[in-house]
């Protein structure tokens, strides 16, 4: 009888044990979720993602190692998990393992490189060649201008614009959609429009205009709706030489000038301005998530460099003096990589040190990635630094 009683109660005991284990598991998940929420600022989720993403990356592994022909005129940019390269002989896109995804051979004297979501834009500054190559679709666009290409840009969704001139016109602006189809052209016989940018979906085109007012140099941004024949409006910028324009969103524009950076709404509202004061602008990068990074120097030559990060209202988020020459710097996500002859340092957007390494060999370029890792370029190779 006792054996029968024991056998009858065993299944219920197992059910109770399963319930206890299930309850404990749910409790652990809830407590873990609460911990992640309340301590989300101190837990580095990027580090966790990097751990699993690069778990098998070693010095002998192919992942994170790139090889190419070295040249002083090469230009580099991150594209997806891989690398885009523009050289005097063309453009190449490599995947995360260093394998070629796409390439196009074109001769260039001064190659320039921009990247969008899936495509790399390459053009010969002062030359006549321009192309876009997609890591998924290969060559999308190949164009040859009548005269020198002054500037070109690619949007986050791979739309393209460029500025040139043609017989009878001081400036001609072209816009292409992400499929490489020409969707807009603007011709001006009276104005110089040497700098341009295009918004997502190729909806808006913006160009910096050079002019005079009462004998004084003046610049402005001419805004175009690509569905209309006439310019939408003009945004004055005063006596500022504009180096670059970028759409930060469909209704916000960033203008990088010789002495000032300006954030503008498309209706003309000034969101913020930042003056470099007595410093000289050496370089800039708007690849950070919601912030602009400037590299400034107190002198035209010398090593009194500083790095400044700015929010979209022009206020400083961080400022840091670097007591040696900055060879290169790059921003992506919430990180900034600063390369000097002695080391590589990665900072967050407040310029708090996040990671560093002195194993930079003869590195000349750095590409920051949004997950906190960085690609160091040295000669004809690139290697991944994982904090």
Region roles according to the model:
Residues 1-19:
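N-terminal Lys/Arg-rich, disordered targeting/topogenic segments
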Residues 19, 65-77, 106-118, 146-156, ...:
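Repeated scaffold domains used in trafficking and secretory/extracellular systems
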Residues 19-37:
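Hydrophobic membrane-insertion alpha-helices, especially the h-region
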Residues 37-41, 90-92, 128-132, 168-174, ...:
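Structural motif
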Residues 54-68, 97-105, 137-144, 181-187, ...:
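A short beta-strand motif characteristic of beta-propeller blades
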Residues 83, 120, 159-161, 202-205, ...:
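Hydrophobic beta-strand positions that form the internal "hydrophobic ladder"
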Residues 101-208, 215:
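Non-cytosolic head/periplasmic domains of membrane-anchored proteins
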Residues 187, 191-308:
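Acidic, serine/threonine- and glycine-rich low-complexity intrinsically disordered segments
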